[in-house]
């Protein structure tokens, strides 16, 4: 059953006023009486709409600088009153039924994001009346429609037109779910903010105690259900943060291809975040969340060609990310050369789509340009808990590098070392990356011992006929023994960049000197698990 409920009276009180005038006009044109408060009421009146101030309706003025506006029985009785059950008591107290509540809340998140936000500023942006009305209307969704998102305005009017001014129960229920999600997210933001302040509260809350609140409340919005998860017996869905600003897999738009799988999303994220490290035209090819080929060049076609040469076998069925617009020459080279699951770039030239359309299974994504990378949190689920840390946005400055070997690196060796250091940050530990002339030539990933990662990187380079002699090597963490240096020297590595910090650093440096290898310490580790 549709269980239609006509909309005769609506209360509008919004902080985000986008589209509210047009929505109110549409309601008024359909015979809906408008109640409103404060700034919303003034805006509607200035737009020549007939609107009744809530204070006139209740007979009680707004007070305490607007802190008390809608907390009144005539408001909440009108919202919570059960039609056909509470009619007599409502009439006795002159309470008019309110059939629709249109509310969004004080901008708490935007306020506390400002660098100069004080506790007093935050407190004044904690909405009280708004969430109370939202919850009241959502609770009584059997009779009342609650609207918290301006994106719903258009379809609400369309449904009213299709149902003689009424809304169906399914629509009211869907709106109620959105409302409870809205208030839950709002309260979570407030709890997280206060949880970061110096405990216990002694009046001095000017300095936060740290990045991590006492209770962590997370809110993500489901973007899509997935056919399955990492494996076919696992159910899965993809959730994203709200109000994202940085270009990412979460904000990307898909231009063609099948729906992204769980593994597609994880691998595309790895590829995109790696390619963001480079200023020059760059290409990153990823397989199973590990880069298998990375290169920079004068353009992305040259970068792709070099990245592919690192490991053509692993590149099959991989993910390709670029940091420049995808052009027709590069797109044609990809589809002529290999099977690829996903291509992601900031943009795609309009002439590229007909070329890619010949391979409809290729998922093509555009993510937009990016500037500075946004600080944030990374999460890792463990059984019974959640590990939380800052995103690894660290990248050592050249001025902080320390040459610890007798021989200093040449200009080209330093360039190669810095290149493969950027790549090593995105390779699963233990990570070893060989690079030469702006391209990776061997990557050893995920081994339990560092020396075996070094050996694997050398084997991969040899398998593809790539010249290791004179290349640079990056290690994501320090060498616990000299064996990794000996393995690198055996294949011709001439420069090594690594964090340093082992109790056997002297032994490791001695090994480098014995082999004539230049060694650079970064003082920064990049474990990735």
UniProtKB/Swiss-Prot annotation:
One Pfam family from the record:
MGS
Query: What is catalysed by this protein?
Result: (6R)-10-formyltetrahydrofolate + 5-amino-1-(5-phospho-beta-D-ribosyl)imidazole-4-carboxamide = 5-formamido-1-(5-phospho-D-ribosyl)imidazole-4-carboxamide + (6S)-5,6,7,8-tetrahydrofolate; IMP + H2O = 5-formamido-1-(5-phospho-D-ribosyl)imidazole-4-carboxamide
Tagged with keyword Hydrolase: yes
Q: Which GO terms describe its molecular function?
A: IMP cyclohydrolase activity; phosphoribosylaminoimidazolecarboxamide formyltransferase activity
Pathway it belongs to? Purine metabolism; IMP biosynthesis via de novo pathway; 5-formamido-1-(5-phospho-D-ribosyl)imidazole-4-carboxamide from 5-amino-1-(5-phospho-D-ribosyl)imidazole-4-carboxamide (10-formyl THF route): step 1/1; Purine metabolism; IMP biosynthesis via de novo pathway; IMP from 5-formamido-1-(5-phospho-D-ribosyl)imidazole-4-carboxamide: step 1/1
What keywords sit in the KW lines? Answer: Hydrolase, Multifunctional enzyme, Purine biosynthesis, Transferase
Reading the lineage from the top rank, the first entry is: Bacteria
| Entry remark concerning the domains of this protein | The IMP cyclohydrolase activity resides in the N-terminal region.
As for family, the record states: Belongs to the PurH family.
- For this entry, the protein name equals Bifunctional purine biosynthesis protein PurH
Classification lineage: Bacteria, Pseudomonadati, Pseudomonadota, Gammaproteobacteria, Enterobacterales
Q: Which gene encodes it?
A: purH
């Amino acid at each position: 059953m549709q269980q239609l409920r006509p909309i005769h009276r609506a209360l509008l009180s919004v902080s985000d006023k986008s589209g509210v005038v047009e929505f109110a006009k549409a309601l008024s044109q359909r015979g809906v009486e408008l109640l409103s408060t404060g700034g919303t009421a003034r805006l509607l009146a200035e737009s020549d709409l007939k609107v009744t101030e809530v204070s006139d309706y209740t007979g009680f003025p707004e007070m305490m600088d607007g802190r008390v506006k809608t907390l009144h029985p005539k408001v909440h009785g009108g919202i919570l009153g059960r039609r056909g059950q509470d009619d007599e008591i409502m009439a006795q107290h002159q309470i008019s039924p309110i059939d629709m509540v249109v509310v969004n809340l004080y901008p708490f998140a935007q306020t506390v994001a400002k660098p100069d936000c004080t506790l007093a500023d935050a407190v004044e942006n904690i909405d009280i009346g708004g969430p109370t009305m939202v919850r009241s209307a959502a609770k009584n969704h059997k009779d009342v429609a609650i609207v918290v998102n301006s994106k719903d305005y258009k379809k609400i009017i369309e449904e009213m037109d299709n149902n003689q001014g009424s809304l169906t129960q399914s629509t009211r229920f869907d709106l109620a779910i959105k409302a409870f999600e809205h208030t839950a997210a709002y309260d979570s933001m407030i709890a997280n903010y206060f949880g970061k302040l110096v405990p216990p509260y002694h009046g001095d809350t000017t300095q936060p105690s740290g990045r991590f609140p006492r209770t962590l409340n997370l809110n993500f919005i489901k973007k899509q259900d997935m056919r399955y998860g990492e494996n076919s017996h696992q159910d899965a869905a993809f959730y994203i943060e709200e109000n994202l600003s940085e270009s990412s897999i979460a904000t990307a738009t898909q231009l063609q291809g099948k729906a992204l799988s769980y593994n597609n999303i994880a691998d595309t994220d790895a590829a995109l975040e790696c390619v963001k490290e480079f200023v020059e035209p760059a290409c990153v090819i990823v397989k199973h969340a590990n880069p298998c080929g990375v290169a920079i060049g004068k353009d992305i076609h040259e970068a792709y060609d070099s990245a592919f040469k690192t490991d053509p076998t692993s590149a099959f069925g991989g993910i390709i990310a670029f940091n420049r617009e995808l052009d027709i020459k590069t797109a044609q080279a990809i589809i002529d050369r290999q099977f690829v699951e996903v291509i992601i770039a900031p943009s795609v030239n309009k002439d590229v789509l007909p070329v890619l359309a010949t391979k409809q299974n290729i998922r093509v994504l555009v993510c937009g340009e990016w500037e500075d990378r946004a600080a944030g949190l990374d999460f890792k689920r463990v059984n019974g808990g959640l590990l939380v840390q800052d995103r690894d946005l660290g990248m050592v400055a050249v001025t902080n590098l320390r040459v610890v070997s007798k021989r200093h690196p040449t200009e080209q060796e330093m360039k190669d070392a810095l290149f493969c250091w950027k790549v090593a940050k995105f390779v699963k530990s233990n990570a070893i990356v060989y690079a030469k002339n702006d391209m990776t030539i061997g990557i050893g990933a995920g081994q339990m011992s560092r020396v075996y990662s070094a050996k694997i990187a050398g084997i991969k380079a040899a398998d593809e006929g790539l010249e290791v002699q004179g290349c640079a090597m990056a290690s994501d963490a320090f060498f616990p023994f000299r064996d990794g240096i000996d393995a690198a020297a055996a294949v011709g590595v001439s420069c090594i960049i690594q964090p340093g910090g082992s109790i056997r650093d002297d032994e490791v440096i001695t090994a480098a000197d014995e082999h004539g290898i230049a060694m650079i310490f970064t003082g920064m580790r990049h474990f990735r698990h």
